[in-house]
Every structure is written in structure tokens, then in C-alpha cells.
């Protein structure tokens, strides 16, 4: 995992964390958005959009039905997803003419979502961070029945894999999975999913011992990418979600005007914006190497020579 430090040697009054091109979505309430990079990118690829009034409403609660739409937009693309229809009511409270019926039906059939024991889905209800992370992990290829997402302790299994996949990266404060997800948090988690590596499973094997047949399910393994899209997100030979489903989206490593590490996002030739990477730790005074190790979560076996300062600002 890439880690860097920002050692600020003087107060910088005009330091900007983001430079946005004219092509980026300009919501009327953009100053209230905490996760601007995520919202800008997810808006640019048309996974999520604002309201007719021109605002985004970042703290508005995400509904279960809207979450299903986001997942479908991510997997199928917004054009194909918008044409989804439900041949039959997927749940008794989701008739075929419901606004989100097609999205909900698709997610149900692919095993990404499940309803309640009484046969309802409650599309207008909010959903927790755990529930949305579960949907995003399903989009990445994780199988709910194999990974324990349907067991009594499903939230623990979801939290572990979601955090390992980096789906909560950049979240301000600790991840609270029982709290209802708002719109900008949903954008952040979905944006991190675009950068996450997809998984797949080998075919199940069957072993017969006497009169007993045992079916063995393989573990999830990272999906390889040997095609031209490798490098759109990470040049690592692995298939990141966006490299499979958003092949026109590219994140280019660069630096901002203060020489800090940054990422320039673009769709085809249209630039979305350039966003400064979030430092793993920032210091404004003398610091001991032991404190740096602790802040970066590094073990004692790692040499101090491997800790690099990628942003050193002199004013």
C-alpha cells in the first residue's frame, strides 16, 4: 500500500487540495461536499447525479432502492441499467412499475441483495454501511453464500473484507457500519470500489468418499488483467473494477502545484479534475521515527530507509 508523509514546515494559507477542470460537475452545494473527488468522478461516469434543482444534497440519506440503482449503473453502465425492467415483482412491496423495480430485480437475481423474512424489500428505507458494503463486495465478485454474508455474523465478515479491500479509504472518522449511509458516503465507497481489485472463484470440486459426496468451494482469488486496460487504475496485472467496467476512465499519477502526490482523473480525453492524495500522516513539528512507524502502521522489521517523504513544503 502506498504511504506518504506531508511535513508542513510553515502555515500555508492558500493551499488547495483539489484543482477541478471546467468539465467537472458543478453542484450548487459543492462547498458542502466533503468527498469531492469521489462525487466528481462518480458523477462524471454517470453512476450518480444530483437533483433537478442543481444541488447534490451530500448528507441526504441513501435509500435501499437508490443503492440498487448505483450497483446496476456500476456493473451495467447507466444506459443499459436504465432499460432494466422487472418481468415479475421481485418483492411484494416492489411492483413491476416501481421506480427501482428493474434495478432491484437485477440485484436480486445476481445475489447482490436480499430482502426481509416477510418477503419485502422496503426500497424507501435507509440502509446501513454494512448493507451497502455488502452490495459493493458483491459487485466486486464476492459470493455472499461463500463469504458468510448470509450468516448471523454477516456484518463482521462484510466489515473485514470491505476494509481489506479499501472501500472505506478516505472516510473522515471511523467507519460506523450500523449508521445509515448518506449520499456522499455512498459516492466515496463506490469510488473506492472502482479502484478495488475484483475477485473470482475456481469451479467447485466434488469428492466422493464411500457413500458421501463432498462439494468443495474454492476461495476467492484476485482477477488477473492481461489486457490493454491494465494501468488505467493500477499497473499491477490485476483487474480493478473500473478497468473492467469503466474502460474510458483513467487515473494518472501526477503532482499538484505544491509538488504533492496527486491523481488526475479523466474520461476519454475530458479531464474531470486533479486531486491531491490524502497523506497518511501530517506533521507540523519535529517528530520521532517511532511515531511515524506507529502512525503508518509499520512493523519494526521495516527499515527507516523505506519510509519516504514525498511532500516537503517550504514557505
Q: Which positions does each model-derived feature cover?
A:
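Feature responds to low-complexity, polar/acidic, surface-exposed segments characteristic
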Residues: 2-36, 49-68, 72-100, 110-127, ...
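Mature N-terminal segment immediately following signal peptide/propeptide cleavage
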Residues: 41-48
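Conserved redox-cofactor binding core of oxidoreductases
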Residues: 191
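Transmembrane and membrane-interface helices of multi-pass
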Residues: 308-311
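Conserved small/polar residues in nucleotide/adenosyl-binding loops
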Residues: 313-315
Amino acid at each position: 500500500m502506498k504511504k506518504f508523509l506531508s511535513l508542513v514546515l510553515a502555515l500555508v494559507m492558500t493551499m488547495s487540495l483539489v484543482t477541478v477542470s471546467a468539465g467537472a460537475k458543478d453542484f450548487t452545494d459543492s462547498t458542502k461536499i466533503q468527498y469531492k473527488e469521489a462525487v466528481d468522478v462518480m458523477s462524471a461516469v454517470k453512476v450518480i447525479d444530483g437533483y433537478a434543482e442543481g444541488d447534490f444534497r451530500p448528507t441526504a440519506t441513501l435509500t435501499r432502492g437508490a443503492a440498487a440503482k448505483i450497483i446496476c449503473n456500476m456493473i451495467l453502465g447507466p444506459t443499459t441499467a436504465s432499460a432494466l425492467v422487472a418481468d415479475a415483482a421481485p418483492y411484494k412491496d416492489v411492483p413491476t412499475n416501481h421506480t427501482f423495480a428493474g434495478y432491484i430485480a437485477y440485484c436480486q437475481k445476481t445475489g447482490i441483495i436480499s430482502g426481509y423474512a416477510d418477503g419485502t424489500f422496503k426500497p424507501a428505507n435507509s440502509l446501513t454501511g454494512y448493507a451497502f458494503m455488502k452490495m459493493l463486495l458483491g459487485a466486486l465478485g464476492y459470493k455472499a453464500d461463500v463469504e458468510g454474508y448470509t450468516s448471523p455474523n454477516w456484518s463482521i465478515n462484510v466489515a473485514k473484507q470491505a476494509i481489506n479491500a479499501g472501500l472505506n479509504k478516505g472516510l473522515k472518522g471511523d467507519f460506523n457500519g450500523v449508521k445509515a449511509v448518506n449520499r456522499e458516503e455512498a459516492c466515496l465507497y463506490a469510488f473506492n470500489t472502482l479502484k478495488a481489485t475484483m475477485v473470482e472463484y475456481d469451479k467447485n470440486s466434488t469428492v466422493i468418499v464411500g457413500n458421501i459426496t463432498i462439494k468443495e468451494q474454492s476461495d476467492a482469488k484476485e482477477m488477473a488483467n492481461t489486457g490493454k486496460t491494465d494501468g488505467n487504475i493500477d499497473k499491477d496485472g490485476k483487474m480493478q473494477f473500473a478497468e473492467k467496467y469503466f474502460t474510458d476512465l483513467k487515473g494518472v499519477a501526477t503532482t499538484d502545484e505544491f509538488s504533492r502526490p496527486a491523481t488526475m482523473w479523466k474520461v476519454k480525453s475530458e479531464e474531470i479534475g486533479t486531486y491531491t492524495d490524502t497523506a497518511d500522516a501530517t506533521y507540523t513539528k519535529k517528530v520521532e521515527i517511532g511515531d511515524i512507524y506507529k502512525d503508518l502502521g509499520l512493523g519494526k522489521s521495516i527499515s527507516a530507509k523505506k519510509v519516504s517523504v514525498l511532500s516537503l513544503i517550504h514557505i
